[in-house]
Amino acid sequence: MNNLHFIKWVFSNRNYTDIIYRLISLFLGYPLLLLSYLIPRSKRKWVLGYKVGFTDNVKYLYRYLYKYEKTVIPIWISSNKSEILLLREKGINAYYRWSLYGLYHCLTSYYYIFSSHLSDINYWTSGGCFAVNLWHGVGIKKIEFATTVGIDSKIYVKNIFNRILFPYLFRKPDLFLSTSVFM
């Protein structure tokens, strides 16, 4: 897909609010990403998150860390404010990704634990972190950059526009858990 077709596809498949939000996050995000490389990080502090909520492997690792690893401070980061309120009622240390506390914890935590991409937590604060992708299932089909049909075949294309608009797709984790070396 050439760049002009990609731009047309973006405008036809997103509402204008999403496009404006994406542009604002890009203009503010890139300077924040550069700043995040300069801030010291604590190896005791781990931020965890998943774009679909407090679920899957990340949830269970959070619960394990909270219960058994007293040298680790697990912090749940979410983009859903109502989810944060529910988690806090259950005693879970949870923050909104763009709140001052959320940004502070993201900028000062060394470990980022997520299920899909760094954007599950906050890509823009991840400079200098150790990224761990727990993934959310066992692959039985082609995904992401291996796809040739559907919406992913348009997003997961290595071109300059995608690298600028979706930089989190191109950041490889430092550790990726898998069921075998063949995955």
Predicted features by range, described:
Residues 1-50, 157:
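Membrane-proximal basic amphipathic "stem/tether" segments
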Residues 45-183:
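Active-site and donor-binding regions of nucleotide-sugar-utilizing enzymes
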